[in-house]
């Protein structure tokens, strides 16, 4: 078993939550900026904006030009990554621990000072629009997105997650900045440092780089709740594909509901791994190529 390594939690006066896990097993450190803003926080007029902002986050600040953040990180032996999901967006830097301070400075600069340059935004939107079009050519993606749209009438689950071409082309720099400045605030952010660092020194550096950021409330748009009874719904899509996709879903309670652990367990028994009931009942009988 791996040894238990405690996590030190600190909340700065401006509301930023800092989690540090000290682990000297390898000379590597990971820095993750976790912002509580994702697809659920987008109004219908701005579908996809959190994902676009993810693409723009490391695209330049007043002191670092376009491409410089990626070059500096790579020069330090590290790499950048990011992802957007329903309730958060996360930005990751992994690099040798000798470059920890430089990596943290880059993360802090991007977090507080991302320019979202208009010309760069226009170029990046073309990349994302092509990404959205590729999803239209992916039967599993189309099946999943169509399933969510069929299952929900009002909830933001119903929308195509990264947006479509028409909506993405309407995203301006002003709208991007408004979303960025509202949600990317210390009280709405968790900064995680894990790896070959000294906990006290790490917290000290974080305090110096992030502590002066203003503590401002987030104006959160939670979106509509789902108040209709779904009943049985069915949708069939036809296309020139080699394998049929079958997707099923049920509305369930939220994560805090007492029935949720039992539902998670049931889902695992049905679908997790080759020993699952669906795998044995469907895949082993050669009724499907995968479950």
Model regions and ranges:
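Active/ligand-binding-proximal structured segments within catalytic/core domains
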Residues: 15, 23-73, 258-270, 280
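Buried hydrophobic packing residues in well-ordered domains
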Residues: 15, 33, 51, 73, ...
């Amino acid at each position: 078993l791996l040894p238990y390594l405690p996590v030190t939690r600190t909340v700065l006066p401006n509301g930023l939550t800092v989690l540090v896990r000290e682990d000297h097993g390898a000379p590597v450190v990971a820095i993750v900026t976790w912002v509580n803003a994702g697809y659920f926080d987008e109004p219908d007029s701005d579908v996809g904006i959190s994902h676009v902002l993810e693409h723009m986050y490391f695209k330049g600040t007043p002191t670092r030009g376009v491409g410089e953040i990626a070059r500096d990180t790579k020069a330090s032996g590290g790499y950048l990554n990011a992802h957007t999901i329903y309730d958060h967006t996360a930005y990751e830097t992994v690099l040798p621990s000798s470059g920890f301070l430089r990596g943290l400075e880059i993360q802090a600069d991007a977090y507080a000072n991302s320019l979202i340059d208009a010309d760069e935004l226009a170029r990046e939107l073309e990349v994302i629009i092509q990404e959205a079009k590729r999803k239209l050519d992916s039967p599993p993606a189309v099946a999943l997105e169509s399933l969510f749209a069929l299952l929900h009438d009002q909830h933001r689950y119903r929308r195509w997650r990264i947006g479509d071409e028409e909506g993405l082309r309407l995203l301006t720099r002003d709208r991007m900045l408004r979303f960025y400045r509202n949600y990317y605030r210390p009280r709405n952010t968790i900064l995680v440092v894990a790896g070959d660092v000294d906990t006290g020194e790490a917290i000290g550096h974080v305090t110096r780089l992030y502590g002066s950021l203003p503590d401002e409330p987030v104006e959160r748009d939670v979106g509509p709740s789902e108040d209709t009874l779904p009943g049985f719904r069915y949708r069939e899509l036809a296309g020139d594909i080699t394998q049929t996709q079958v997707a099923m879903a049920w509305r369930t309670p939220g994560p805090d509901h007492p029935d949720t652990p039992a539902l998670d367990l049931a889902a695992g028994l049905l679908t997790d791994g080759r020993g699952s009931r669906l795998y044995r009942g469907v895949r082993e009988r050669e009724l499907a190529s995968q479950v």
